[in-house]
C-alpha cells in the first residue's frame, strides 16, 4: 500500500478521533467505516469546518449576553462590557484570554438598524477595537495603529443597509448581522493606570442609530434559563451532534450570509441539506454520520496545527501564523483560530506564537509542570513591537492557570532583571525560582501547559516576526 499525505492525514485523524471515544464505542462502531467511499461523510466534515466559526461565535454571544445587566465579563446585547481588572483563572468565556489589556467589548445586532460606537481621545496609549463579523473576520479595526489617538465615531451598518448618517460619523459596513466589538486597552495593572483606563472605558459610547444624539438608556437584558452558563463554549459546541449543529448553522446563515467567495462551498453544502436562508433538511444527512462528523471534523481542525500546508510556521518549538483576522476561503485555518484563539486580530495588529513542547535541537517533548524551563532573550533581542509583548501561561484547554502570585503572563511590565551579559531569562516552572528571580518567573501548573506569546503591533521592518527576520528563542528544559 502506498502511503500518501492524504492517507497519513486520515490515519492521524483516526488516532485523534479514537482518543476521544470510549473503548465500547470504538469496538462497536469501527472508526474506519466512514472513510471507505463515503463522499457525503467528507462533505459533512467540510461543512462542519466551514461553519465552526459562525456556530462558535453564536454560542459565545449567547453566553456572554445572557444577563439582565452588565456584570463582570458579561453584558446584554448592545451594552459595553468594561473589564476593570485582568481576568483570572476562573474566566472561561473565551479561549486564550488576554492578561495584558482591559477588554472593552460588546455584541450588537446590526441586522435591524446600525449602531453608533464612539471612542474617546486615547493620546499615546495603545488600544484597538477590532470589529468581528459572525464568521470571525475582522472587517474593521480602529486603533492606535490605524486611526490614531483622536476622538472618533463610527456607525456599524448591516448587510443591505442604505441610509444617511449624521455628520462626523464614519460608516463601517458589517457583512453580517452579528458584530463583536472586541476592544483592548493596554494597562500596566497598577492602581493608577487602572483608574486612567477606567476613565477611558467610561467615555466609550454605544447607541442604536435611531437614538444617536439623544438621552438613550439601554433596556434590561433578556435572560434565557435554558442557556448553559457553566460549560465552556468550545465544549458546548463540540458536544453538538451533526443535526443540532447544522440546524443552528442554517438558522444563523439567514442573517449572517456567506460571502460571494463562498459560492462553491455553498453549492456543495446543498447536497446535504444546508442552504443559506432555509432550514436544515436533515433527511439529506445520513443518520450514521450524526455522531461521527463532529468528532472527525474537530480532530481535523486541530490536526491543522501540525499539517497546515504553510499556514502555521514551526520555529524553535513555537507555532505561529500571519494568517489571522482575514481568511478568505481558508476555512480550516479560520476554524483552527476559532478553536484556539477566538477573537484573533489581523497580523498587522498582533501575532500569537504558541508552544506546546520544549524543543532542543532535534528533540521535543510536551511541557510538564514537573520540569523547569528557561527561555532566554539575547541582549537587545526582546520581541520587536510598537505596541507590547507578553508570554501567557495556559493549561491544556487554553485557559489561565491558578498560581500563588496571580501572574498569568510575563512581559516588560514585570521589570525583568537582565543577566550580566544583558540577556534576559524567563523562568517557566511550577515552583518559585527564588525571591531574587521571581520578577522573571512565569508560574506553570503541575500538569501539561501551553505558552502563548503576544506581539501587538509587530514591527514591519527588520528585525520583524512578520517576515521572519526576528526568531523566537526556544523554551529549554533546565
Language-model segments: residues:
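Intrinsically disordered, low-complexity, compositionally biased regions/tails
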Residues: 15-18, 321
